[in-house]
């Protein structure tokens, strides 16, 4: 395309691969940056250093993301594997600290995980006359962060509902470990009273709330999700999509689970909140299974990928892979050939009874 394009987006993968200029609106000011998203991170980090300590937390977050951008694919994979080996160390550190600083999103540690987290064996599941999952097996290790990817309607949310017991399996076995405490963020974000303020929804009107195993000021906790000052008094019924997503994250993460099921938590989130959520997951001593279309998020955070690889003949086929999204895509091309990287229409197989 030879013309100019102005795109409003929070998709960092798109910004890094397509954008030549980035214009950021920050606290009433417009800051132009020449270059892609990686260049933006470098330039903004320098600007925040000049602005001083008041932006120290943001500068640290940008520095962490920039270090990841500069690392090689091999370095990223090594870091992902190191996380899986560090569960005991991270859990012990969380128990020693028992303090949360909620200027940024932080996820409270849950109970210690045992040797079994989640084991799936030959899962079979259909819905509305269609076969969605057929023969899926995987084992989720402690400290694993799984990115679940695939087009809408292929069974990602249905899989979550089978894990939490809202949907029965048609076949196979799904074993949830005895030490697992589930926290689930519903894609539909239902059950929120539209007449309450968002602070009341999170706090039940209490000045102090229990966040995992830590008691803390409720307004400070709510502020960590981007709701500052008067924003906390907004009625829940008038919130935008991104605001409702942040509110639901706040509600769920305060439960203190050690296995998080996050159904498209990255939808409608701004870049700063996305980065804050990524850092929180990377520091979290526990497991997370995340349905998302955000490729940057999948590259930076995921230790495993659960990918829908349906075909015309087998539209209910899934593939379990250890590694991030970039590694998975290379593996997919090696296994299935160059055409595997191209998107194709979704087809479904009708359920049949033997």
How does the language model describe each region?
Residues 43-84, 90-97:
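Intracellular alpha-helical coupling/juxtamembrane segments of multi-pass membrane proteins
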Residues 1-56, 102, 106-354:
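ABC ATP-binding cassette signature C-motif
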């Amino acid at each position: 395309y030879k013309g100019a394009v102005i795109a409003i987006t929070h998709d960092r993968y798109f910004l890094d691969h397509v954008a030549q200029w980035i214009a950021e609106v920050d606290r009433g000011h417009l800051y132009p940056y020449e270059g892609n998203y990686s260049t933006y991170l470098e330039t903004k980090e320098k600007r925040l250093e000049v602005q001083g300590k008041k932006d120290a937390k943001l500068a640290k977050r940008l520095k962490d993301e920039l270090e990841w951008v500069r690392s090689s694919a091999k370095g990223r994979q090594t870091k992902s594997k190191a996380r899986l080996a560090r569960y005991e160390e991270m859990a012990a550190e969380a128990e020693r600290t028992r303090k949360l600083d909620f200027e940024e999103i932080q996820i409270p540690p849950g109970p210690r995980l045992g040797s079994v987290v989640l084991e799936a064996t030959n899962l079979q599941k259909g819905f509305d006359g269609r076969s969605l999952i057929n023969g899926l097996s995987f084992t989720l290790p402690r400290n694993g962060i799984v990115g679940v990817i695939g087009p809408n309607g292929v069974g990602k949310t249905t899989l979550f509902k089978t894990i939490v017991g809202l949907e029965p399996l048609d076949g196979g076995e799904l074993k949830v470990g005895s030490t697992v405490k589930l926290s689930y963020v519903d894609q539909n974000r239902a059950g929120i009273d539209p007449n309450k303020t968002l602070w009341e929804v999170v706090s039940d009107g209490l000045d102090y709330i229990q966040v995992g195993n830590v008691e803390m000021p409720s307004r400070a906790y709510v502020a960590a999700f981007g709701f500052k000052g008067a924003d906390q008094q907004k009625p829940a019924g008038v919130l935008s999509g991104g605001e409702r997503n942040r509110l639901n994250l706040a509600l769920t993460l305060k439960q203190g689970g050690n296995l998080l099921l996050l159904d498209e938590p990255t939808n409608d989130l701004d870049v700063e909140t996305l980065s804050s959520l990524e850092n929180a997951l990377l520091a979290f001593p526990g497991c997370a299974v995340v349905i998302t279309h955000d490729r940057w998020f999948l590259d930076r955070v995921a230790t495993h990928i659960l990918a829908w690889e349906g075909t015309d003949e087998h539209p209910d086929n899934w593939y379990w892979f250890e590694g991030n999204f970039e590694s998975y895509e290379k593996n997919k091309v090696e296994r299935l050939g160059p055409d595997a990287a191209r998107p194709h229409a979704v087809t479904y197989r009708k359920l049949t009874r033997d």
